[in-house]
């Protein structure tokens, strides 16, 4: 029940409080060079891409947010239905609750709303140090018919929660066991503080093929925990990390330095399809957003669909104005960083 209460707190705080990182994602330092003569018909712009052996109509992921409560069930169902209509991917929030409270399954079950989407199950990697087994990880995947399992890394969040899990020792070998055991790929994801080149390499070396950088610039989970603090000391500790983390753009570059061959998701502080286009150009395969979708999904499926359409149109216009007919063309679009051309 404590886990369910925490999830309720997280939704309410994210919807009503300012929990943004004090750091920028870094994408404002990157600008596309405008192409005044693209020689393309806008109606022929192709935003499709392939991810986890499925075709996405746009390289967009509704990043993991919630689950485990009635409100979360409604949010997830609206997100999934909108993702199905748009042909984009979706991640579920942490499913640890399901292992202790089986009755929460319906808060994560969205396949009836979204039979065709790329769907990602999710649990905190540190739970492998607290008794969660590879077999249970497979159960999470099977229970929602997911295409992959996210193991999220939230060390700073855990350390700033009074009830947080603080033993992160010898975790990498356990993650490797899950990678080798599962019938689907494992995605390693930070939660808003970024992955370094060194950390990325550690996961690549044990067989992980997909990384979500989830850098700084968007939601800061230490700030969320500051609002949950039950005394002033806990609040002051959590609040002091507002400027912590690797900005998303920097993390994206670091992960790409670690490997050109893995799949990379860019998330963390992306505000628009323009930021998403920049992320694709800088090495991401797809890009994820959470905050804009959460607020919409708390109201209606139609608002989620409108938000998705906004991001897709921003992406398409960016592609048109850079002369990029396809996502592969966009990856080579002319770009300037801090007023210096990038090639």
From Swiss-Prot:
Enzyme Commission identifier(s): 5.3.3.2
BP GO annotations: isoprenoid biosynthetic process
Cofactor: FMN; NADPH; Mg(2+)
Keywords on record: Cytoplasm, Flavoprotein, FMN, Isomerase, Isoprene biosynthesis, Magnesium, Metal-binding, NADP
Residue numbers binding Mg(2+): 158
Superkingdom in the source lineage: Bacteria
InterPro entries: Aldolase_TIM, FMN-dep_DH, IPdP_isomerase
GO molecular function terms noted in the UniProt entry: FMN binding; isopentenyl-diphosphate delta-isomerase activity; magnesium ion binding; NADPH binding; oxidoreductase activity
GO CC term, one of those recorded: cytoplasm
Record: residues binding FMN: 63-66, 94, 122, 189, 219, 269-271, 290-291
One protein family per Pfam: FMN_dh
Catalysed transformations (reactions): isopentenyl diphosphate = dimethylallyl diphosphate
Coiled-coil segments on the chain, per record: none
Binding site for substrate: 6-7, 94-96, 157
Subcellular localization(s) per the UniProt record: Cytoplasm
PANTHER family per record: ISOPENTENYL-DIPHOSPHATE DELTA-ISOMERASE (PTHR43665:SF1)
Its job: Involved in the biosynthesis of isoprenoids. Catalyzes the 1,3-allylic rearrangement of the homoallylic substrate isopentenyl (IPP) to its allylic isomer, dimethylallyl diphosphate (DMAPP).
HAMAP family: Idi_2 (MF_00354)
Summary of subunit composition and partner proteins: Homooctamer. Dimer of tetramers.
Family: Belongs to the IPP isomerase type 2 family.
Protein name: Isopentenyl-diphosphate delta-isomerase
